[in-house]
Swiss-Prot record:
Gene3D superfamilies: YVTN repeat-like/Quinoprotein amine dehydrogenase
The keyword Metal-binding belongs to this UniProt entry's keyword annotation: no
Sorted UniProt keywords: mRNA processing, Nucleus, Repeat, WD repeat
Compositional bias per record (Pro residues), positions renumbered to this chain: 591-603
Protein name per Swiss-Prot or TrEMBL: pre-mRNA 3' end processing protein pfs-2
Organism: Caenorhabditis elegans
Length: 809
């Protein structure tokens, strides 16, 4: 019936055709085509595109492939080039910029035929090596460039991925070493020849179709297909080259004329010409007619054996490389040598023309070097002197011309690619980290988890100590180099109690939590022991006082232990140069308490009404620099003559804050003790040429007590006027006070801070200690020189030895 009527179980005339997906569209959805709207297509078969990509040795062998390694992705560049080619003409195309961000705009090699230098492959990508280490004699790419096939000494085929360069599969192809590999022009057959003289036929799926013996018990060194793929030629160590019929596996011609082994062979790309190279030094290169088997020409320019010959695709140029370290190019139209290329230091073993650029070729040497050449220049345009450790037996370009594979006698197969935008020619292995080079590769690399903070790093950050004259510790120096903000300004110099550095403490502490701090250096501990031993402060010294207004610790006998006075400034770590620690009370009880010292110091000048009360002492002077970091001390009970604490400028560095008021009884708990040490950043030196630092070269520790004590900085001479001032001290003028006469700059004796002067029995001891009361530190020797040393006891042990330990080292 016509129209819409149907008979019985007749199906409607609807053709649903499912287009099978090719290998390049494996993940795409199948297309459903409705052809019932077109009656003329009713009886036509649906055209199915063949799989032209050739999937190689089967998909079942790829289940262990993991594309997680670094690879060369040329698909995006090709797609961008095809898209931009539709609307860009000539000079409008995007230029490649020297940055990795422009990598996507890189164009394939065939899009720039006028710029062959873009295909100088000097960037190392990856090394491929079999589990069984053996020399690689031959390499060849699959026709579509998806895989690289290598033949090694063990007779195995190894397939490597052409994008990620990882291992895919391996199979035993021959019983002896594979010496040659060659694909047919129709890309359907692969020929392989081995050391035993056998030739095998292989299909693209690595199926062995046929095998025969071409040269009996002699190695086959080369293979060459005819342009029509009907015939092929072999070169052998028996001194002959033979022409074979591919379909019938029969020998057609034997080319005899060389007096030694024939090492290489190549067939002309369009004509019936065969070129062979031999170890015969008299007839190294010959041109043959495969139909008649006669020799057409002999090229004798090489003075040694020839290891490689290859025709250019234009059919006019012939390259030869020999053991004389030379590469020669001949024009076969004139049978004349055109150029000679000299750069190799050893024999030339392999040659390869670029598949896209006609005038570019590469040569491999016996020393593992790779050299890139242009036919119009005698000097190389690219050189990799140590690409391999040994001779390069074979090298092949990728069909697109952007990758070069080399097989060497050092058991390695290496891949070389073009430089990315921004890479330098010298950076062969991609080691440069400047700009954005290698940034994408670093993002893909796994990162190490930060180490867990130890007990030391979990504590509150304490500023590091700095000893003048000893230099910076290594970790502190490295820390400064990492922090550019601290190195660009002069206000961040590391000195004791530098408030600017305290402001940077949170910043530094955040970085130090991830750094394992090294132990204290031996030089630093040795310096502290020398300092404690040489200071020589024993019983009756300045550190052990019985001031009622003092701020020390009391022992069982009522004595007080005050902080030591040193010229290094108040230590930032709590007293010790190595770190804070608490003194042990039993160590202090062994020191006999001195007598109470009262009265003004000998060189103390007083200005204003006298102080009332014989037992009134002076608290430590206030800290300079204003109220930074909470260091300002609140004034104690009472006032200085009812006028408040004296204020004045000291060297132009802020206001002196504090009070010399009398204190009755113990101080309040909320008052924090501030050590009355010297801030040598603002105090003048004893001489014009002095820096005020510790001179380690002149320190003499453990000096015997006989005679005058040794001084590494001698006390200034005492004049007649100064002696009278010590007997009758004038009033203090805080506004115009010589820093050397400032009571804060003295060695810190408590008897110098008493307004009523020392008792007569102590004046004599003060006179005997002459040089010990100067404002610069002295070194004394004695049997009990380490007893009562507060700075050393806080470091731990008797005499300041060790860190929190009671016994010496």
């Amino acid at each position: 019936m016509n129209g819409g009527m149907m008979r019985g179980n007749q199906m409607p005339n609807v053709t649903l055709t499912i287009q099978p997906s090719t290998s390049s569209m494996q993940n795409s959805q199948p297309r459903i085509m409705n052809n019932h709207h077109h009656p003329h297509n009713r009886f036509q078969r649906e055209h199915v595109m063949p799989d032209v990509m050739g999937d190689g040795p089967g998909r079942r062998l790829r289940k262990n492939v993991a594309n997680v390694r670094r690879h060369v992705d040329y698909v995006s560049t090709v797609l961008n080039h095809c898209e931009n080619r539709l609307w860009q003409y000539g000079k409008q195309r995007i230029l490649q910029q020297p940055d990795i961000l422009y990598q996507q705009y890189a164009v394939p090699a065939d899009s720039t035929p006028d710029v062959p230098v873009d295909c100088i492959l000097t960037k190392f990508i990856r090394t491929a090596m079999n589990k069984v280490k053996c020399p690689v004699y031959s390499v060849c790419w699959s026709p579509e460039g998806k895989r690289l096939i290598t033949g090694c000494q063990t007779g195995e085929f190894t397939l490597w991925n052409g994008t990620a360069f990882n291992f895919e599969t391996i199979l035993q192809a021959h019983d002896s070493a594979i010496r040659a590999l060659k694909w047919a022009s129709n890309e359907q057959w692969l020929l392989s020849a081995d050391q035993g003289g056998y030739v095998k036929y292989w299909q693209p799926n690595m199926n062995n179709a046929h095998m025969f013996s071409a040269h009996k018990d002699e190695a086959i060194r080369g293979l060459a297909f005819a342009p029509t793929d009907v015939k092929f030629a072999t070169a052998s160590d028996d001194g002959t080259a033979r022409v074979w019929d591919f379909a019938r596996y029969t020998e057609e011609r034997v080319l005899r004329g060389h007096g030694a082994e024939v090492r290489c062979i190549d067939w002309h790309p369009t004509k019936g010409l065969i070129a062979t190279g031999s170890r015969d030094t008299q007839q190294p290169v010959k041109i043959w007619d495969p139909k008649s088997g006669s020799c057409l020409a002999t090229l004798q320019e090489h003075k040694s054996s020839v290891m490689a010959v290859e025709f250019n695709k234009n059919g006019n140029w012939l390259l030869t490389g020999g053991r004389d370290h030379l590469v020669k190019m001949y024009d076969i139209r004139m049978m004349k040598e055109m150029r000679t290329y000299r750069a190799h230091k050893k024999e030339v073993i392999s040659l390869a023309w670029h598949p896209i650029h006609e005038g570019l070729f590469v040569s491999g040497g016996g020393d593992g070097s790779i050299v890139y050449w242009m036919v119009d220049g005698e000097k190389e345009i690219g050189l990799l002197e140590h690409a391999h450790d040994q001779a390069i037996w074979s090298m092949k370009w990728h069909p697109l011309g952007h990758i070069l594979a080399t097989g060497s006698n050092d058991n390695n197969t290496k891949f070389w690619a073009r430089n990315r935008p921004g890479d330098t020619v010298e950076d062969i292995f991609g080691l440069s980290n400047t700009n954005m080079i290698g940034h994408l590769d670093k993002e893909r690399e796994p990162r190490m988890a930060p180490p867990k903070p130890s007990i030391e790093t979990q504590e509150t950050y304490r500023p590091d100590t700095f000893i003048p004259g000893m230099g910076l510790d290594e970790h502190l120096y490295e820390q400064l180099n990492r922090d550019h903000n601290m190195m660009t300004t002069d206000s961040t110099l590391l000195v004791p109690d530098d408030l600017t550095r305290q402001n940077f403490a949170p910043m530094i502490g955040a970085k130090r939590t991830l750094i394992k701090q090294p132990p204290a250096k031996k030089a630093q501990r040795q310096f502290e022991r020398m300092w404690n031993n040489s200071k020589g402060i024993g019983a009756g010294s300045d550190d052990f006082t019985t001031m009622k207004g003092g701020l020390g610790r009391e022992d069982a006998e009522g004595a007080q232990f005050g902080p030591s006075k040193s010229f290094l400034g108040p230590p930032t770590t709590g007293g010790s140069l190595l770190g804070p620690s608490q003194p042990r009370p039993q160590e202090f009880r062994s020191v006999p308490p001195p007598q109470q010292q009262q009265g003004p110091p000998p060189n103390w000048r007083h200005q204003g009404p006298p102080m009332s009360g014989p037992g009134q002492g002076y608290g430590p002077p206030g800290r300079m620099g204003g109220n930074q970091g909470g260091w300002q001390r609140p004034p104690p009970q009472g006032s200085y003559g009812g006028q408040g604490p004296p204020q004045g400028s000291y060297g132009g560095q802020g206001t002196l804050q504090g009070s010399y008021a009398s204190q009755q009884g113990p101080p309040p708990r909320q008052i924090q003790h501030i050590p009355s040490d010297i801030d040598y950043r603002t105090a003048p030196s004893s001489s014009n040429g002095s820096t005020g630092d510790v001179d380690m070269r002149t320190m003499v520790p453990n000096q015997p007590p006989s005679g005058e004590p040794e001084h590494w900085r001698g006390p200034p001479p005492v004049s007649h006027q100064q002696q009278s001032q010590q007997q009758h001290p004038p009033p203090i003028n805080m506004q115009r006070m010589d820093p050397r006469r400032d009571p804060r700059m003295l060695s810190g004796r408590s008897d110098q801070l008493s307004p009523s002067g020392p008792p007569p029995q102590q004046q004599q001891s003060s006179a005997q200690q002459g040089g010990k009361n100067q404002w610069m530190p002295q070194f004394e020797a004695g049997q009990n020189q380490n007893q009562g040393n507060y700075a050393g006891n806080r470091g731990g042990g008797v005499g300041g030895r060790g860190r929190g330990r009671g016994q010496p080292y």
